């Protein structure tokens, strides 16, 4: 029975996360780019000025439940995760350095996709019985497409609830305990027998912290993420830039391997990778799965933003993809390629390759700081996905009374994830994660005209000033 479930899940997973899904996501991103006049390029300076330039200004009086900065930090908390460290390493190992170039290309379209998701989420959001602003794909399907498309909103919420326990929590906690275990063993191998107990303790502590943050409501979530995300991002950026500076002599070759290797991977992988298609596939998939453009999840956080201007908040969607993929993922690639650490091209790789890059540059002590970065990334992801799951549960059951019990259960999963091998459950959750994109992409396709109209009205009026 278990084998049958695993086989069926693998078949569905391969399709959902395979080439058809990537083609659909890229196609929708291209359509949205055309209908908005490639807004992400034309208005990129405006997007940066509107986001980074105003992040720390005093917020305008409004009726939201998060500041725009807190909203983007919450979305980034869920988006910038362990995949930025492990996923990029895997893309380079299988697709060669050229995969990074194709990752950049996918991010370019992803910027417009996420911009559209955020804009629609703010435009079609509503208030729940507690007076909180709620939105996301299920709400712009419900309020933007009408009753006959309601089943898509229900499906999105169902897939979201089924996803968060594995993708958003258990796998992340497992990454935390693995990072801590590795750091401990690097200094004292005699404590190996104590690790199961240590993992349980870590799981309990994480569960308590998650419960404290999530049960505190939307304002506490925003307060935590606006402090944690800038810290962890800056911390990782400083470490990664340090690797580039200390290995600056390799930078010209690395850039050549990325750009030229995108079209001739064989020349830069010792002949191990000869397929340009494989380089494209791995780079594009890494870009899509890293920034979550097309899944619609980030828009759930942005819908809580303290703003009356959907398009202006949408600019944070452009910034989010830029920060996640163009900055964080690129820096991970630079750590691996600039450090000169051996890459077994053609063989699967993960976080260990990135850690090896840091260790080759800074020495063994850097394993502690890498573990700290992994823990911060994973914990922030748990917080962000907790919000997503609670919003999906609230929509699915049509009452906010399920939120409290849901978050308690969600927090408890941290203990399970820290102490058990959940291989099949993780794979099933990953499949449901991919299934979330189907109703969202359909909605984006049908509402692309609304996005184009909102953009035109915004920049033609006073809103852009």
Would you name each region that the model predicts?
Residues 24-31, 35-48, 173-180, 198-259, ...:
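Membrane-interface loop-to-helix entry segments
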Residues 59-94, 120-144, 155-161, 273-322:
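Alpha-helical membrane segments and immediately flanking helix-loop junctions
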């Amino acid at each position: 029975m278990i084998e049958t479930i695993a086989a069926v899940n693998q078949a569905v997973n391969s399709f959902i996360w395979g080439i058809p899904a990537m083609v659909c996501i890229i196609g929708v991103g291209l359509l949205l780019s055309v209908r908005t006049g490639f807004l992400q390029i034309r208005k990129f300076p405006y997007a940066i000025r509107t986001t980074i330039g105003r992040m720390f200004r005093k917020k305008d009086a409004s009726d939201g439940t998060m500041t725009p900065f807190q909203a983007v930090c919450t979305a980034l908390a869920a988006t910038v995760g362990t995949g930025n460290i492990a996923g990029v390493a895997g893309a380079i190992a299988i697709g060669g350095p050229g995969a990074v170039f194709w990752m950049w290309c996918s991010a370019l379209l992803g910027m417009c996709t996420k911009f559209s998701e955020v804009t629609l989420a703010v435009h079609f959001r509503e208030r729940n019985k507690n007076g909180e602003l709620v939105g996301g794909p299920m709400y712009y399907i419900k309020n933007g497409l009408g009753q006959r498309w309601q089943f898509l909103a229900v499906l999105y919420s169902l897939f979201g609830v089924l996803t968060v326990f594995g993708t958003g929590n258990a796998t992340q906690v497992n990454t935390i305990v693995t990072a801590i275990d590795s750091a401990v063993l690097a200094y004292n191998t005699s404590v190996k027998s104590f690790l199961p107990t240590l993992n349980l303790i870590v799981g309990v502590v994480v569960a308590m912290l998650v419960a404290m943050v999530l049960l505190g409501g939307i304002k506490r979530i925003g307060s935590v993420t606006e402090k944690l995300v800038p810290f962890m991002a800056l911390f990782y950026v400083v470490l990664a830039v340090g690797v580039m500076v200390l290995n600056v002599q390799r930078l010209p070759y690395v850039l050549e391997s990325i750009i030229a290797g995108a079209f001739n991977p064989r020349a830069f992988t010792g002949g191990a990778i000869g397929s340009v298609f494989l380089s494209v596939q791995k780079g594009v998939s890494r870009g899509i799965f890293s920034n979550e453009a097309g899944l619609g999840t980030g828009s759930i956080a942005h819908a809580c933003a303290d703003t009356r201007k959907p398009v202006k908040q949408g600019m944070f969607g452009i910034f989010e993809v830029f920060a996640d993929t163009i900055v964080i993922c690129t820096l991970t690639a630079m750590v691996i390629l600039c450090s000169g650490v051996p890459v077994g091209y053609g063989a699967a790789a993960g976080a260990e390759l990135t850690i090896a890059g840091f260790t080759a540059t800074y020495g063994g002590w850097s394993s502690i700081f890498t573990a700290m970065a992994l823990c911060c990334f994973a914990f922030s992801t748990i917080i962000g996905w907790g919000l997503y799951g609670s919003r999906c549960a609230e929509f699915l059951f049509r009452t906010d009374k399920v939120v409290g019990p849901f978050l308690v259960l969600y927090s408890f999963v941290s203990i399970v994830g820290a102490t058990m091998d959940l291989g099949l459950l993780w794979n099933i959750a990953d499949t449901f994660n991919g299934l979330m994109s189907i109703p969202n992409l359909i909605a984006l396709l049908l509402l692309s005209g609304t996005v184009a109209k909102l953009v035109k009205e915004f920049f033609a009026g006073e809103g852009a000033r």
